[in-house]
Structure formats: C-alpha cells, structure tokens
Amino acid sequence: LETLPRHLIVIGAGPIGSEMSQAFHRLGAEVTLIEGRARVLGRDDPIASEIIGEVFAAEGIRLKLNSHAERLWQDEDGIHVMASGEEIVGDALMVSVGRRPNVLGLDLEKAGVAFSPRGIQVNDKLQTSQPHIYAAGDCTGSYQFTHYAGWQASMAVRNALLPGASKGVRAWVPWTTFTEPEVAHAGLMEAEAREKYGDAVGVTDWPMDK
C-alpha cells in the first residue's frame, strides 16, 4: 500500500489480522474485521481475546464475528465482500486466514518422506519418516513463529550430528500478539491444562491496569 485506505476489510482475526486491524484503524482508516469464530484471537485464552474484542469495539473497529466471506469481487465502487449475507464495500482488502507449508515440488515422495497438506511429518526429535532426514520450521506444520523455527533448527542440527537426541516440548513455546494491550502466552491454555490435570488446576487473575 502506498496510501492509507479509506476502508480496510480484513478477513481473519488471528494474530496478524488483529494486529493490522488495530494499526490501520489507529492510522485513520475505517476497518471491518471479519472472523468465522465467535471471538477475535480464537486460539488464545478466552478471557484475553474477550478483552481485545472489547478494546477493538470501543476504538471503533467493526467486528463481524461468526461470519464467513462467501464471495469477493471488485468494480468501480471498490472491493466487495459478501459475508454471511451482508455486502461490505471497501477500497483495500487483507486476507489473514493462515498459511500452508510450501512442500510441493520438493520431490519428497522420491525420498520416501511422508507429508500432508499440513506439512512434513516429524516426530518429537524432528526426524521425518526417513530417520536420517530431519525437518524444522514452518514446513513441519507446527507453530509458525521465527523464534520457534530457529529453536527447531538448532535441535535438528544437534540431533543429526551429536549423540543423545533431544526432544521438543511444544508446551514451552511462548508467543505474543502485538495488539494494544499485548496478548502473551506460554504453556498450556486453561482448557488444555484442565483436560490434562483435572481439578488440580488453579487459576488466578491479576488486573495489570490498576
């Protein structure tokens, strides 16, 4: 973009869609955020995502939740999005609905490496279906974060070249969504912890704005 859009339509209220929606709105653009789930940041803690949704609504970002983009077209009036029966017209569109690992064209079949549309299949030591071949980063279909890919790469090199294989623990991975306020996460979500540990889980809320 070379100029600030008058009305930006964003499809997908994950981390990138949420960050960009708030950033462009604060720069002065009208923003409509379309999300198929019932809340923004649907993979984050429900309490945190509820707070972000309330902040967005208070700032004037239009949230269209439980909605799916069914049709897109462009004409002299702008970019049209038909979302759950409503036509929304803007002059810029951002699609933020996730990424698929780009593994086609690598001839993985010839090497006997198993993969799916979600990425190359690896075990907790980052070995593929061919134990002497390792994979790391976004191509494994795991967390798509730069810091996580770097950590995986270092573990893959260590396991491939040195004795004593290390295992990766996904529950340790932290991430942050740079909205305002920020949403930071590390370890299990409450629902995941309760599923694993039952009534042994305790929850404490600390208001950080007081």
Summary of predicted features, one role per range:
Residues 21-26:
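Gly/Ala-rich phosphate-binding loop of Rossmann-like dinucleotide-binding domains
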Residues 27-124, 208:
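A Rossmann-like FAD-binding core segment of flavoenzymes
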Residues 62-64, 134, 202-204:
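General small-molecule cofactor/ligand-binding pocket signal
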Residues 45, 58, 69-70, 99-102, ...:
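Mid-to-C-terminal Rossmann-like scaffold of FAD/NAD(P)H-dependent oxidoreductases
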Residues 11-14, 138:
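Glycine-rich Rossmann-fold phosphate-binding loop(s) that bind the pyrophosphate
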Residues 17-18:
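N-terminal Rossmann-fold NAD(P) dinucleotide-binding loop
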Residues 1-5, 88, 92-162:
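FAD-site-proximal beta/loop scaffold in flavoenzymes
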